[in-house]
Swiss-Prot record:
This is Probable inactive beta-glucosidase 33. It holds the Pfam family Glyco_hydro_1. It comes from the Eukaryota. Disulfide bonds join 215-223. A beta-D-glucoside binds at residues 50, 150, 195-196, 339, 399, 446, 453-454, 462. Residues 1-30 form the signal peptide. The lineage of its organism: Eukaryota, Viridiplantae, Streptophyta, Embryophyta, Tracheophyta. The active site is at 399 (nucleophile). PROSITE patterns: GLYCOSYL_HYDROL_F1_2. The keyword Cytoplasm does not apply. Keywords: Disulfide bond, Glycoprotein, Hydrolase, Signal. One of its GO terms (biological process) is carbohydrate metabolic process. Gene3D superfamilies: Glycosidases. Glycans are attached at residues 222, 436.
Amino acid sequence: MATGELALVSSLFIVVVFLLLGAVAREASALTRHDFPEGFVFGAGSSAFQVEGAAAEDGRKPSIWDTFINQGYMPDGSNADVSADQYHHYKEDVKLMYDMGLDAYRFSIAWPRLIPDGRGEINPKGLEYYNNLIDELIMHGIQPHVTIYHFDLPQALQDEYGGILSPRFIEDYSAYAEVCFKNFGDRVKHWATFNQPNIEPIGGFDAGDRPPRRCSYPFGTNCTGGDSSTEPYIVAHHLLLAHASAVSIYRQKYQAIQGGQIGITLMVRWHEPYTDKTADAAAAIRMNEFHIGWFLHPLVHGDYPPVMRSRVGVRLPSITASDSEKIRGSFDFIGINHYYVIFVQSIDANEQKLRDYYIDAGVQGEDDTENIQCHSWSLGKVLNHLKLEYGNPPVMIHENGYSDSPDIFGKINYNDDFRSAFLQGYLEALYLSVRNGSNTRGYFVWSMFDMFEFLYGYRLRFGLCGVDFTAAARTRYLKNSARWYSGFLRGGELRPEKSYATL
């Protein structure tokens, strides 16, 4: 080798060594928000039914969740009639967000507040409230990220035609979504059509432990009717078509003028095999297809996953060629809500005469929301899965959080350092995923405030900010995690000696 060539190789070797050392040093140093790409959004979230209160004020009418609660189906007997009462405290709440340094606030619009009967007249008081909230956020430099539907279907539509189980839902939802675009889209630039449409069909129409309480034996009991083997798939199909319809309206009539983006938010749990058996490994892959691919596969490829087609058969609705064209690509981003891993085992579906979603998937596993474990590596697996299987779509992490122990029910609790540790682990895992090519563009903590939690009432509290539910004024207070997150948002370091990314 000539002297010049040797010198060139030596120089290149030194450069490579420095780059590698820099990468190692970067992993060992403290992480700050400035290590994320420019424009990366950090925020926190809520939903209308859970945080607003004012359940019977200013023209709002009941949702299916109001009915569910009033009929006595909440295990702890609680309700969301007042909850954190953001309806009356939104200015105070936005000031808290501003003081903490949030880039964005994710919230939902209550369909029964904006259009109380589900269709027809707009409630002027509802319109006023959301305009005021959006304006207050923008005045404080906080982006509004709006979910159009977060489980709170107007009871009027459930009574009239069975709600989401009927294809009539698609037209009514589309009209409601257009009201939102028309009235708020000049200021709202980030829309999600649905929150967790891959969960509502299971709870409401398979297990029947959520409204409208439809199920069939042996998959649920004490239901109002239903068929657990077919209705979850029908409902999911209607949600998918309603999503595509709303996106089509937005793109054809509003997007070019308003300059916003629209997507959908899915629950994305990660499934791992319970044992090292080949059957359990296959079950985990299959369950990720049933859970994530149920919506993402048609959104990206235009049809349901092949494994669902083969295992569900004729009970899985067909996607017509015209519907496939509307559904495929009907997103500018994918929102994901991720909390934990479920370890699953394979079961023999052929031995089951009666079938539902989980029998069709051929898996069993434990879903323990009350005891969330920190497996932050799972977020990396989720984001890598989206990158490899679905073309690396733009992603917004719309929910990630940890609940206080039920033992502190009814108490004011500032000390939630484990929440800070939990979030730090996931932020570190998120950073590594972004560095490795994930197209993730935002992260929202669930939740901004303590509030009513679906099925759990006030026993589980996810808030960065606490709420004194014993006080009529619903006094807010900053927990330790709120101060920790605020420090990060303002450029502070996530200390490496307190790293939880491997948990």
